């Protein structure tokens, strides 16, 4: 009997202990739509646990449901060319390249996996604006890029932002630099009668894109 008790004690000591995954909550200064209570956010976080530990990204991705950016949401979850979830995080972009220091975000591929790095200056941006940005960056899934691909991605961002404002108008926090970006894109979309006409002109005039080819795999000139 004593021997059996010792065995049971040893088994209990060697049994792996599982802990619930912990997430970084949305900053308290970020205003969320009423739908996004902490209880609701916690209920969706497991779906995005392989993407990020930061719940502000979980909220942003959830906001893409029912928008034109749901394709991007699914791509971030792993339905992309690599078949792996995209890792999303805030990161000082100058650590990658000093030339990226003022960028809002970049998509990156490393060792066969995709990453979306967002400038930390947007840590307190409305999740709806982050959602539109993610819809853009998730379009880039390989090492290639082009003017046509950027035109498509910027247009997608503008369309998604327009849709999110209809669903979550409180996302339009004019104190946010990211919201300023999104509203400029929205204006270009509307100016072109909801076509890419003026967004395309802006992309082609962007000094940072001057060395890009016209097309890339999956993106023809339109």
Language-model segments: residues:
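Sec-dependent signal peptide recognition
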Residues: 2-10
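Hydrophobic h-region of N-terminal signal peptides that target proteins for export
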Residues: 11-18
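Auxiliary, metal-adjacent structural segments of Zn-dependent hydrolase domains
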Residues: 36, 41-115, 173
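Soluble non-cytosolic domains of exported or imported proteins
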Residues: 51, 124-129, 133, 147-148
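Active-site recognition of the HExxH zinc-binding catalytic motif
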Residues: 132-144
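Post-HExxH zinc-binding segment in Zn-dependent metallohydrolases
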Residues: 145-184
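Pan-zinc metallopeptidase signature
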Residues: 190-222
């Amino acid at each position: 009997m004593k021997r059996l008790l010792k065995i049971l004690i040893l088994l209990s000591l060697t049994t792996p202990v599982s802990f619930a995954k912990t997430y970084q909550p949305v900053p308290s200064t970020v205003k969320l739509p009423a739908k996004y209570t902490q209880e609701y956010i916690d209920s969706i976080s497991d779906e995005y646990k392989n993407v990020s530990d930061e719940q502000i990204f979980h909220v942003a991705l959830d906001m893409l449901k029912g928008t034109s950016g749901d394709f991007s949401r699914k791509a971030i979850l792993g339905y992309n060319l690599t078949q792996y979830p995209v890792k999303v995080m805030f990161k000082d972009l100058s650590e990658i390249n000093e030339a990226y220091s003022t960028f809002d975000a970049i998509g990156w591929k490393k060792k066969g996996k995709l990453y979306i790095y967002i400038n930390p200056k947007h840590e307190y941006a409305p999740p709806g604006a982050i959602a539109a940005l993610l819809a853009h960056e998730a379009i880039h899934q390989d090492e290639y890029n082009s003017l046509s691909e950027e035109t498509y991605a910027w247009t997608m961002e503008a369309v998604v932002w327009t849709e999110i404002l209809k669903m979550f108008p409180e996302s339009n926090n004019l104190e946010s630099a990211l919201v300023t970006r999104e509203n400029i894109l929205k204006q270009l979309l509307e100016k072109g009668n909801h076509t890419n006409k003026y967004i395309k002109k802006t992309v082609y005039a962007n000094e940072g894109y001057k060395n890009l080819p016209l097309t890339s795999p999956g993106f023809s000139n339109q």
